[in-house]
Amino acid sequence: KTHDVLPQFESQRDINIVGTPHPRRDGSRRRAAAPEMANSTLALLHLPFFLNPIRPRAAALHLRRRSTISAMASSPLQKKVLVPVANGTEPMEAVTTVDILRRAGADVTVASVEENLRVDASWGLKLVADSLVSDCGGDSFDLISLPGGMPGSATLRDCAILEEMVKKHVSNGGLYAAICAAPAVVLGSWGLLKGLRATCYPSFMEKLPPDVTAEESRVQVDGRAVTSRGAGTAMEFALALVEQLYGKDKADEVAKPMVMRPRHGEEFSMEELNSAEWKSNNIPQIFVAVANGVEDMETVMIIDILRRAKATVVVASIEDELEIVASKKTKLVADMLFEEAAKLEYDLILLPGGLPGAQNFAESEKLINLLKKQAESKKFYGAVCASPAMVLERHGLLKGKKATAYPARWSALSDQSEVQNRVVVDGNLITSQGPGTSMEFALAIVEKLFGREKALEVAKSVVFI
């Protein structure tokens, strides 16, 4: 049967047309009128991507703006992008932005504002930057994009070198962006949203300066400024940046293979067969394998969401080192090497996808033996993207099971009867399709382990619904 993981919220729309701003009663801030007012010149984003049952195909990326950046949109040359990070940065927002912009061909520099390249992002995720912000001061960029998270946003705000760089960039007409807390905490504090329409994380809306028109759109574009709400809107945000840099055709091209959600902000579902109760005697213990070449977004989304739900997640590297380089060159630091992590017992073992990451998993005898032991014990296991086909199917771990995988890998599955579903649960197995389904995959796991209300709570907290 088809089981709705999250209910539909009628008030949330893919197209959010906002009316003319009006003053609040106390005169402290301009806010936009209700979404129902259709006669608006407001620039905002509509990103409906639809999955074709046979081949992933993205619908058109529609972006309206108060003013265009035609020079940036028309140039085919590689664009240079700076993404600063700090301790406490929201990892989904940082990594999703970097991943998608690199898919578009941008030269993205992840720069630490800390003293070291390694930053301890939120939810226990450890990232390694490409350089220090202090070493980027003489460089010019086509885009500077600020991830959110706290205290990461406050640290970005307090970095004098970064402030000088961004202000100079904006004064020179550069494209700039921020998501989550960063529009209010960083750009607002620096006076870079004055007179503009902007959005941010819901609990920070009141922290936007009075001279900013606060919008509740998932992604807001006003001239050269692009803002967004949170981790659950990060993919939409990043694709808006691709369109601003390279144009609509490139944004559509990048979106197609990612298996995007049909309607952003609304319900999602999983196909569940042979329903089984997923329960743990204590806090669920989850093993997430990583290797060089795993898919950046998938890996980070799974870890982040499950830790938000209060599961204990161990990130284990099957490589000889803790640090791995993901498929889009994000550098992540695992919690343990495989040999140490494998000494523990787990309720659930998960594999992100990506290439050559899935191939590395498939060739790891120690990982395959652990998975087979897990399956034989009737414990829970799962995989996303290329891994269901390249790892689980290849090693007999889908025998008698219904599953899905990345659409280009469907033909490798012996049973393709459920492949069109974005998330499939069959007893103790869960599989999913790709980067654009990873949030749904993680939230489906949250519901199976913790219940529907917890899944709703986590989904709302990241502005996924």
Where are these regions (language model features)?
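Anionic-ligand binding patches
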Residues: A198, A403
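Extended, subdomain-level signal for the structured scaffold at the beginning of enzyme domains
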Residues: R29-R30, A34-N172, A184-G195, M205-E216, ...
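Intrinsically disordered, low-complexity basic segments at termini and long loops, enriched
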Residues: K1-E36
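Short, thiol/selenol-centered motifs that function as redox-active sites or metal-ligating centers
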Residues: I179-P183, V384-S387
